[in-house]
Every structure is written in C-alpha cells, then in structure tokens.
Amino acid sequence: LLLTGIDRLRAAVRVQAERHKHTPMIGRTHGIHAEPITFGLKCASWYAELGRDRRRLVAARDEIAFGKLSGAVGTFANNEPAIEATILGRLGLHPEPIATQVVPRDRHAVYFTTLAVLGGSCERIALEIRHLQRTEVGEAAEPFGKGQKGSSAMPHKRNPILTENVCGIARLVRGYAMAALENIALWHERDISHSSVERVIAPDATLALDFALARLAGVVEELDVRPAAMATNLSRLGGAIFSEQVLLALVRKGVARDQ
C-alpha cells in the first residue's frame, strides 16, 4: 500500500516538475525573497526526496521481515532450526539469527522511524503548498471543489484544509515512531510492555500514512499553479534579487564583502 502510494505521489510530482520546469518564481530563504528559481525545480526536489523515501521503505520492509520459532527464550530447547526456517520461509520471513522470546524490537523501530521520515517528506510538500496559498503569496493553491465551503463564518475564504490535514497526520506518525523507539528496551529475554503499543501503532501508523499519501497525491495532481502571481512576486524587489552578482563583481575588484 505505502509503496503504491509513494509511486502515485512521485508520478504526480514529476508531472508538475516537467510542466513547470520553465516557470520562474522567487526562491525564499528564511521566508524572505532570495534569488529566482523555477517551480519545476521545487517539484524536482520533492521528487528526489520521495525517491529516497521509497528506497528507505523497501530497506525497512526487508529489515522487519524476520520471525522466530526458536522457543521460549530463543534456545531451540524443544524445536529444530530447520523447522523454524521451513515455516518462516512459507510466510516469506527470515529466521531471526539471535532471538530471545521475541524478535528484537530495533527492527520494528527502523520501520516506524522510516514511516516518520516519509511522513515528514509529505509534510514538507504540504507545508510548502500551504505557504504558497497564503493570500499575500497566492502562487499556488490546493484544489477547491464546486460547492465546497471555505469557512463556516467567512465564506470568502479558501482554506488549505487538505494539506493541513497531511501536516497533522505527519505529526501523529512521528509520535508513533517515538513509541517504537521506546519499545526497543525490554526486560531480559522479554516482557510485554511493547505489545499494547504495537497493537495501536502498527495499524494506525500504516493506515494514516497511506491516507496522507493518497490525499497529498490528489492535491498535487490537481494543484492550481499560478505563473502570473509568481511573476508578480518575482518582480516585487526589482533588481535587488540579483544582488549576489553585484557583490561578487565588487569582490573581484577588491572590495571587501562587509563593505
């Protein structure tokens, strides 16, 4: 599910990157106008990050694909390793090389922290869209359906509720990752302090992130990109956005940077 969701989102981002590779806009650092970029470049950065997320998720899936049937404390006191290998093989799992009563929970922590990083990537895209949709910026906006209400009290508004929702889910998944990290340390060969946690975070984190990926993909697919507003904002500071070129020319002539 998650890999399919990443693939759909990456495909949508790639379309926008290619469509707007020549759409100029102002780049911002610290929220302040910096130098020109293109909207396609911004999307290309998202695309590359999602590719890294996909590779990490595949690696995390492999990391967690282990099981154990080696007895109460992992000693094979009443079982044979061959039996464990056969049964786990049928389930598509590998035998845990050195188990206790359970598979060590560092494997699970890697999986959930990977989900948290993926959630952070989704939040990065969603947060950018939210910023670009602000009235003072107006360079892009999430889709707004016919008959959709922007605000119960202020009907003129078009709030970025879809991307806000994605940002909220990312926070939730990060919290689940922290819970998974807390599960690594168990008493001796096992206690069950991890069990109640995993019963919640395993389905919730996976399903919440699947939903966020689908929602964000829909937003990117139907994203309202506004090149005219980008051009207006790009010219807001006049030629000041090319100040670095002036600075470098002066430095080459011997003027100190702090002058």
Which residue stretches match the model-derived regions?
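Long, non-coiled-coil amphipathic alpha-helical linker/lever segments
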Residues: 1-34, 94-107, 188-193
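Hydrophobic alpha-helical packing residues
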Residues: 2, 6-9, 13, 20, ...
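Internal glycine-rich alpha/beta core junctions
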Residues: 7, 35-186
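Charge-rich, acidic-biased intrinsically disordered regions
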Residues: 16-41, 68-84, 139-154, 192-198, ...
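Short polybasic/polar patches that bind polyanions
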Residues: 18, 89, 251
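Glycine-rich cofactor/substrate-binding loops
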Residues: 154-259
